[in-house]
């Protein structure tokens, strides 16, 4: 539904189906004067229900080109992802390569990579719109693009020209699937405590140490690997980033390379790519694969990616929230009570739906604003942190309300809302915990508003 004020009248449009309804100023003014009343919320709930077939509520401010891109990815999700997502989750399957190949054809992995390196050269804003659509179908699908995003951002901001020319076209085409090998056991969010070592030895670095929570680690072709090159430099300064190539593994042989071993971590949600522990024991990386060909810049290079990564993660959260909203709303409309009435006609259920739609729109606009600031080249760690924190909270709240609307059925694994709840929980943890985001926001507020 697109809500807009034209003259003195409130217009509600369904962009997709061409529906146009118009109500006079009296009804519009009543909604304002009555405030957050049950009656007003029920009116809004009815407007949402009337436009539900469009799956697009509120004016998100997309131009015509971006709207076409959104529709293209929505069709892909509806055809290839949504019908299969719950089965992938329940069986804990890797996302099929056939689906990844379709994503490659659509340009998912090269969206923000400049055209001169084989990408589409799209904006961070467009990337948000696409990511939300992908995550709306399945968080694992939306997160596949994140692997390429992180790798591309590292290369664009910190790589040599030779490294950019070698890796960016392969990442953009989907020929090379990257993964981030960062977190270590017992380190939590403290990168300065990392112990994995990279020792220069002739034309190679030898990697020794342990990593955990490696998303898509087995099936990837190149690792963004953070290791300590200078043991005398404590904290962040001794860390370096490597573009460590590896053989692609599978469920039967996860890590075929000499010097790498590991295993799968069974997880509550966020499936489809799988999580791994990895042990490095004498694994070789060519010296030319040191990012930027300069030691000690690893943490700084990672910092360069944080704004983009958190904006993209906020977009993933929006997709999960939208999925929870649509799933709950459809269930409430279809499910009849003992008197033959729809659950959606119950004020408490309708009120939950209205709150979900409102919170999603608020989080979406904050995320879009952060993305636009990033596209302008402005510092946006404050906005990115806020967007990630808010969108993650909204996703969890929407999933929780969705389960409640389903009642006992929401607790049954056969219903997709149970998967959405599991998927939404990770959003407050990865790519910077909610607590880390709060710290960032606090520091920025203090620095810009000193006492």
Q: PLM features: what roles do these ranges have?
A:
Residues 81, 142-162, 188-191:
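N-terminal glycine-rich flavin-associated loop
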Residues 2, 57-71, 136, 256-361, ...:
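Glycine-rich beta->alpha junctions and the first turn(s) of the following alpha-helix
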Residues 8-9, 13, 82-90, 330-337, ...:
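C-terminal helix-coil-helix/basic helical segment that borders enzyme active sites and/or dimer interfaces
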Residues 8-145, 166, 170-173, 177, ...:
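Amphipathic, small/basic residue-rich leader segments at the start of a protein or domain
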Residues 204, 208-258:
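A short core secondary-structure module
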Residues 1-7:
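Single conserved hydrophobic/aromatic residue that forms the stacking wall/gate
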Residues 196-198:
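A structural signal for short hydrophobic beta-strand segments in well-ordered beta-sheet cores
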Residues 408-436:
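Internal helix-turn-beta structural module
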């Amino acid at each position: 539904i697109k809500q807009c004020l034209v003259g003195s009248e409130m217009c509600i449009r369904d962009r997709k189906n061409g529906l146009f309804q118009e109500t006079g100023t009296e009804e519009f003014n009543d909604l304002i004067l009555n405030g957050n009343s049950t009656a007003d919320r029920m009116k809004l709930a009815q407007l949402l229900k009337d436009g539900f077939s469009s799956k697009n509520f509120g004016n998100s401010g997309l131009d015509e080109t971006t709207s076409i891109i959104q529709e293209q990815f929505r069709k892909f999700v509806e055809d290839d992802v949504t019908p299969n997502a719950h089965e992938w989750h329940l069986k804990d399957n890797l996302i099929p390569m056939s689906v990844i190949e379709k994503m490659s054809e659509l340009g998912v992995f090269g969206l923000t990579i400049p055209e001169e390196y084989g990408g589409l050269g799209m904006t961070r804003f467009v990337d948000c719109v696409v990511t939300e659509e992908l995550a709306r179908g399945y968080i694992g699908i939306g997160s596949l693009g994140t692997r390429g995003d992180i790798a591309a951002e590292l290369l664009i901001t910190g790589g040599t020209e030779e490294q950019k020319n070698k890796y960016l076209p392969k990442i953009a085409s989907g020929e090379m699937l990257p993964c981030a090998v960062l977190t270590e056991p017992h380190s939590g969010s403290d990168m300065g405590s990392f112990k994995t070592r990279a020792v220069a030895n002739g034309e190679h670095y030898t990697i020794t140490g342990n990593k955990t929570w490696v998303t898509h680690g087995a099936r990837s072709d190149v690792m963004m690997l953070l290791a300590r090159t200078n043991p005398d430099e404590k904290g962040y300064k001794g860390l370096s980033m490597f573009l460590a190539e590896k053989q692609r593994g599978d469920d039967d042989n996860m890590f075929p390379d000499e010097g790498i071993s590991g295993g799968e971590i069974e997880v509550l949600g966020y499936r489809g790519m799988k999580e791994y522990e990895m042990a490095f024991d004498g694994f070789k990386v060519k010296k030319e694969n040191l990012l930027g060909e300069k030691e000690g810049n690893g943490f700084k290079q990672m910092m360069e990616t944080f704004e983009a990564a958190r904006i993209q993660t906020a977009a993933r959260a929006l997709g999960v929230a939208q999925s929870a909203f649509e799933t709950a709303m459809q269930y409430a409309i279809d499910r009849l009570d003992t008197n033959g009435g729809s659950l959606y006609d119950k004020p408490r259920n309708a009120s939950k739906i209205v709150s979900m739609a409102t919170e999603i729109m608020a989080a979406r606009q904050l995320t879009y604003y952060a993305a636009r600031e990033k596209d302008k080249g402005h510092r946006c760690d404050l906005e990115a942190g806020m967007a990630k924190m808010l969108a993650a909270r909204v996703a969890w709240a929407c999933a929780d309300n969705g389960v409640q609307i389903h009642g006992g059925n929401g607790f049954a694994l056969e219903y997709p809302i149970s998967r959405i709840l599991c998927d939404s929980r990770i959003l407050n943890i990865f790519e910077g915990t909610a607590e880390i985001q709060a710290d960032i926001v606090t520091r920025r507020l203090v620095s810009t508003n000193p006492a």
